[in-house]
A protein has these predicted regions:
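C-terminal tail/extension regions appended to the core domain(s) of diverse proteins
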Residues: 1-17, 24, 28-45, 51-58, ...
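Phosphate/oxyanion-binding active-site loops and adjacent basic polyanion-contact surfaces
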Residues: 15-23, 75-79, 124-127
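Active-site metal-binding core of divalent-cation-utilizing nuclease and nuclease-like domains
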Residues: 46-107
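Conserved catalytic cores of phosphodiester-cleaving nucleases, focusing on short active-site segments
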Residues: 82, 113-121, 131
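Short, flexible loop/turn elements at secondary-structure junctions
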Residues: 86-88, 120-123
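Active-site-adjacent loop/helix micro-motif of nuclease/hydrolase catalytic cores
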Residues: 92-96, 122-133
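Short His-Asn-centered micro-motif
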Residues: 117-122, 149-153
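A contiguous pocket-lining binding segment that forms or flanks enzyme active sites
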Residues: 129-147
């Protein structure tokens, strides 16, 4: 088994982890407990590509100025390790012309995310910067999506999510990556010795669960004028 452990680093799928599947199980339980009129056929739980934006991309001046304007609107997708999303058909009509929006992988529905989780065994500065940038872009298109990162081990010397679109950052094992590496350098750089990892922390897992629950149950996604006058304030989903 040691030969296999040497062959893959901590970010591969070959190490012992059920990170994404774990959140899917909790999300299924969460939705079953909610007192909401859910159409379960429209709810998607798991990894996938969520809609992140639409952009104008004509292939020629004739297409841009002609009658086929709908063909110039392209969807942009983002890979998600885990999400709770709404499945929906998406039809766009421009100048009485239906835009044939093609989804990634020929999937017939679009996924509109309510919750997204970036799942990592560990995270370094470059990966963290990418996560912060992706969160900011997501919030520009979908401001009411809860976007969080969960990691098992930490490689960062400084953790700061201020100014980004990221809503939360959770470390499930409360342990540094350096503390879980092979002692004698038996594997590649940053290879994790699973026997040295801390167990998953129940309190942190509960925090993630509560964050998802509070977000989905929130009644402050929208505030009409009457409610605004009655309560005297509106917050950004907090």
């Amino acid at each position: 088994m040691l030969e296999f452990k040497r062959a893959f680093n901590a970010q591969t799928k070959f190490h012992s982890t059920v990170h994404e599947e774990f959140w899917a199980i909790l999300a299924q339980h969460l939705l079953s407990q909610l007192d909401l009129p859910l159409d379960r056929a429209r709810v998607y739980i798991g990894p996938g590509q969520s809609l992140q934006g639409l952009y104008f991309h004509p292939e020629s001046p004739e297409q841009a100025f002609g009658t086929q304007l709908g063909n110039t609107i392209k969807p942009k997708f983002k890979d998600r390790d885990f999400m709770i999303a709404l499945k929906t058909d998406f039809n766009l009509t421009l100048n009485h012309h239906r835009a044939p929006l093609k989804t990634s992988g020929s999937i017939p529905e679009l996924f509109l995310p309510l919750v997204t989780i970036e799942c990592k065994q560990y995270i370094d500065k470059t990966m963290m910067d990418n996560a912060l940038s992706a969160a900011t872009k997501l919030k520009a298109f979908s401001p009411f999506t809860l976007d969080i990162v969960t990691i098992e081990l930490n490689k960062l010397s400084d953790v700061n999510i201020a100014g980004s679109g990221l809503d939360g950052f959770y470390i499930l094992r409360k342990q540094k990556l350096s503390e879980a590496r092979f002692r004698n350098g038996d594997g590649p750089k940053d290879t994790v010795d699973v026997a040295r990892r801390n167990p998953l922390d129940n309190e942190v897992i509960l925090k993630v669960y509560e964050a998802m629950k509070n977000h989905i149950e929130s009644n402050r996604w929208h505030c009409d004028e009457e409610a605004f006058f009655e309560q005297g304030f509106v917050t950004n989903g907090l």
